[in-house]
Amino acid sequence: MSAIADITAREILDSRGNPTVEVDVILDSGAMGRAAVPSGASTGAHEAVELRDGEPARFGGKGVQRAVEAVEGEIFDAIGGMDASEQVAIDETMIDLDGTPNKARLGANAILGVSLAVAKAAADEIGLPLYRYLGGVYARTLPVPMMNIINGGKHADNPIDIQEFMIQPVGAASIAEAVRMGSEVFQALKKILHDAGHNTNVGDEGGFAPGLKSAEEALGFMTRAVEAAGYRAGEDIAFALDCAATEFYKDGRYHLEGEGKVLDAGGMTDYIAALAKSFPIISVEDPLSEDDWEGWAHFTSTLGGAMQVVGDDLFVTNPTRLRRGIAAKSANSILIKVNQIGTLSETLEAVELAQRAGMTAVISHRSGETEDATIADIAVATNAGQIKTGSLARSDRVAKYNQLIRIEAELDIAGRFAGRTILRG
């Protein structure tokens, strides 16, 4: 395997028009890997820390020139000449160099950009697609998408408290068919919303952001769209929610301001249970606050037999927090976001840890994305079975679906679509 010969970084824009880091790693053979780093809007308090410049006169303080300098300076000095195939050693070298528990000194955005680009360069060196390089001969499962078609919360400017309302085409036979089904429902929903007098502007992740007043109303529109597209809700297409409950958790209570409700953890459990009785909800993410461990355990013991309970802000792709959650039976699934932990090797460790504990893993985008489709390869490499990467609009979201379609075509008969195997209960 070739050694790392050069690393260059640059400041580019993400899908929200904010700066982010892009990194090129060049090996002495000429092989190259390029990676662009995503960024979140609703971020957990325990996530790895992005390094921003903090200069108000430039990008409103959000510039990433300091992270770029860290990549081309300290990080290159530390890992230049290392074997690109030694992913764990390279990642650990960067972690040690940073010296903080949350990668705050050099920036998780700097470290992650290098980590992903190193893996891509190593794959390029031996002529393998990234999913095959990372996952080996067993990388073959095409994930069921979670497609965000209605946005609320921090992802939209409307009264809906819940952040994401998603569809999962569990009845599809392939990823290509799943994408088609999702697109047809998305277009049907657009017409139904328009005919009902709602705007059809889209939010950060490509879903519609209509001025609806409640989760029940949003789920009702989704059901109508599924049926209008010629499918059966609950049979062909199931629903998933991302509550992002930390965003409306204050003083020990959950404030659903759009619906005029103030609930405790038990009340939130009952609230979701009631929605699940009326609609085919098979997965709910972050139904409680990121540090409400007791509430999470109660929620999962109550509803986890029938639905997937996904920890995002709870776990922040961190193996240490995940181990605590496994011991406490806080959730039965983890959302995997590469920039929450900041290196590829730690990301893969979290997936493996969850799977060994009998949990599912959902590979996820962030609200601030780029055309980089690395997470599609990671989803297949880990046989995760599920991917969350936004709506059927905006090229930064569609790029991941298109990459999955390419991978499916390349795998041919060796590939399998996860489909109904993700269902619980």
UniProtKB/Swiss-Prot annotation:
Q: Catalysed reaction(s)?
A: (2R)-2-phosphoglycerate = phosphoenolpyruvate + H2O
Molecular function as annotated in GO: magnesium ion binding; phosphopyruvate hydratase activity
Q: Which SMART domains match?
A: Enolase_C, Enolase_N
Instruction: List GO terms (cellular component aspect).
Output: cell surface; extracellular region; phosphopyruvate hydratase complex
Query: How is its cofactor bound, per UniProt?
Result: Binds a second Mg(2+) ion via substrate during catalysis.
Short name of any one Pfam family annotated for the protein: Enolase_C
Its pathway is:
Carbohydrate degradation; glycolysis; pyruvate from D-glyceraldehyde 3-phosphate: step 4/5
The kind of enzyme this is, by top-level EC class, is lyase
Q: Which residues form a coiled coil?
A: none
Keyword annotations of the record: Cytoplasm, Glycolysis, Lyase, Magnesium, Metal-binding, Secreted
Which coarse location class describes where this protein primarily resides? cytoplasm
What is the required cofactor set for this protein?
A: Mg(2+)
Q: What does this protein do?
A: Catalyzes the reversible conversion of 2-phosphoglycerate (2-PG) into phosphoenolpyruvate (PEP). It is essential for the degradation of carbohydrates via glycolysis.
UniProt similarity note: Belongs to the enolase family.
| UniProt protein name | Enolase
Species source reads Acidiphilium cryptum (strain JF-5)
Q: Lineage in the entry? A: Bacteria, Pseudomonadati, Pseudomonadota, Alphaproteobacteria, Acetobacterales
